[in-house]
């Protein structure tokens, strides 16, 4: 599970800064949350803070997992500890997929496990590869895949090491409506199977509502935005 309270950052200088704030967010195991809002409202900025990439200016509480409190490590910007947490506890899925072009699909998928010293294969991973119909594509390179195939491969890579939290930045942005719905259905199924949490940035409110994601929407307030649970 993940619990965050009092997270905020101001981008820009003091006179023309834009403040992005998250008063509270809680996601249980098996639960998916969505960050929505207008372009420029700070969705990606917030995801970078939650992903331990961007240091917040303010933070009251940050719990990652059942009993791992990382508030002080985040505020102190302890890079070695944060890098270890990112590698072990978080999985990232980018708009473009983010697959390394010089690695095959299988090598891309196995990369997070190898970096953590895990065996490259697991029974669960083999099941997921078959379930997402990626087995015939494992020896191909990303350039040889369709957009939908790349996103499926990127999703499996993001959760191959069974992280506590999956973070996905507009994972359906390049997909047509049919493939977008299919990808979200796969994310829902796999998140429940792994009993992890997930947080997605999405511009598609209809899909967020259709799948019943917990919904945190950016409300513009003065010189900034506040993400409030709907």
What residue ranges belong to the model's regions?
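Catalytic Walker B motif of ABC-type/P-loop ATPase nucleotide-binding domains
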Residues: 166-169
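Short coil-to-helix segment of the ABC ATPase nucleotide-binding domain corresponding to the Q-loop/switch region
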Residues: 103-110
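Conserved ABC ATPase "signature" region
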Residues: 121-137
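Conserved ABC ATPase signature
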Residues: 141-151
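Hydrophobic anchor residue at the start of the ABC signature
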Residues: 155
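Conserved catalytic motifs of ABC-family nucleotide-binding domains
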Residues: 162
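ABC ATPase NBD coupling module
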Residues: 69-91
């Amino acid at each position: 599970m993940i619990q965050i309270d009092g997270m905020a950052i101001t981008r820009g200088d003091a006179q023309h800064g834009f403040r992005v704030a998250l008063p509270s967010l809680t996601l249980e195991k098996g639960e998916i949350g969505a960050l929505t809002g207008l372009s420029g409202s700070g969705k990606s900025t917030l995801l970078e803070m939650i992903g331990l990439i961007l240091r917040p200016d303010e933070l009251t509480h940050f719990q990652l997992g059942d009993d791992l409190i990382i508030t002080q490590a985040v505020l102190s910007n302890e890079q070695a500890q944060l890098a270890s947490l990112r590698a072990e506890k978080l999985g990232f899925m980018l708009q473009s997929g983010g697959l390394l072009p010089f690695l095959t699909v299988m090598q891309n998928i196995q990369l997070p496990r190898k970096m953590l010293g895990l065996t490259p294969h697991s029974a669960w991973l083999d099941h997921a590869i078959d379930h997402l119909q990626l087995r015939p594509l494992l020896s191909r390179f990303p350039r040889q895949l369709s957009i939908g195939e790349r996103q499926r491969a990127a999703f499996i890579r993001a959760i191959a090491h069974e992280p506590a939290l999956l973070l996905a930045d507009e994972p359906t942005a390049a997909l047509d409506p049919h493939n977008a719905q299919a990808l979200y259905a796969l994310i829902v199924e796999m998140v429940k199977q792994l009993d992890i949490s997930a947080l997605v940035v999405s511009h598609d409110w209809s899909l967020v509502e259709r799948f019943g994601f917990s919904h945190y929407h950016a409300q513009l307030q003065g010189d900034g935005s506040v993400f409030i649970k709907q």
